[in-house]
Amino acid sequence: MTAHTALDGLTVLERGWLSSNNILIHAAAGEPGAVLVDTGHVSHAEQTVALVRHALLGERLHRIVNTHLHSDHCGGNAALQRAFGAPITVPPGNADAVASWDTMRLTHATTGQSSERFTHADTLSPGAHVVAGGRRWEALAAPGHDPFSLMLFDARHGVLISADALWENGFGVVFPEIDGEPGFDDVGAVFDAIERLPVSVVIPGHGAPFTDVAAALARARSRLDGFKSQPERHARHAVKVMIKYHVMEERRIGHDALLQWAAATPFLLAAWRLFGGGTPPREWCARFVDELIGQGVLAREGDQVIDR
């Protein structure tokens, strides 16, 4: 996308899929410093610190705000806190889990992901706002992908930081559905809420900023309808996403070690209990590894599975 004037004063560090995008909102005159939204994966933490330091150009990092606390959005928190001393703001529903560092409630342990403990200074509730870059960013509830997830909306310029609630081509895995809780209707309600907003440009959690919001919503709704009509399709997608994500984190892993990880990961086991059909969990997970290799998303070299 050609640079949009609504993004003036923002630096979007587009990362990929293992790490979320990092959005640096540069300080306007009279503000105490820049605000960073989301910090990527822990395995990229040193790179994130370097990227943020370069983008700051000597400016002070005043605060870090997390849209939600999945491992790909908060993994750089601790490293950035050490490097810049910036306080961290989290959604209120996550505050107790952060304070006690309950990795099960944070979903890092349930999804088999790595994380580094950090401390938070305060919370940002839906309906509250953050002033950064001379803009008023309203926090909007965005449950579905994560029950406590937030979006940030600058109504004056029409900029929506959507996290994983909406990408240009899809949206994040609806984790509650695998845990036996409703989530699809929440996702649809968030789409409806986005449609009612005067959005000119979306900064997603993954992928480049985009302006054709109507087309993105149409694609997302079509995908959601497919998942609602065939919940097993969503579960299969979720399992493959998590396996791919783990291999991205490891870069290369033994086939047996990957299956051992998969068959012991609570989130994948929850999907297996719903749709495994009596197949042993290790064998069931092996099918998804084979599918990912067949699709060219992963590769097999001897006994090693490698990212592609």
Tell what function each PLM region has.
Residues 41-132:
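Active-site HxH/HxHxD metal-binding segment of metal-dependent hydrolases
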Residues 25, 38, 68, 80, ...:
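Divalent metal-coordination and catalytic microenvironments
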Residues 41-43, 136-143, 147-231:
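Metallo-beta-lactamase
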Residues 44, 122, 182-186, 280-284:
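Soluble or luminal CAZymes and related metallo-dependent hydrolases
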Residues 33, 63, 86, 158-159, ...:
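The start of beta-strands in P-loop NTPase/AAA+ ATPase cores
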Residues 4-10, 108-112, 133-135:
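Short Pro/Gly-enriched beta-strand edge/turn motifs at strand-loop
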Residues 2-59, 151-164, 168:
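Conserved beta-strand hairpin/beta-sheet module of binuclear metal-dependent hydrolase folds
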Residues 235-308:
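C-terminal regulatory/interaction regions
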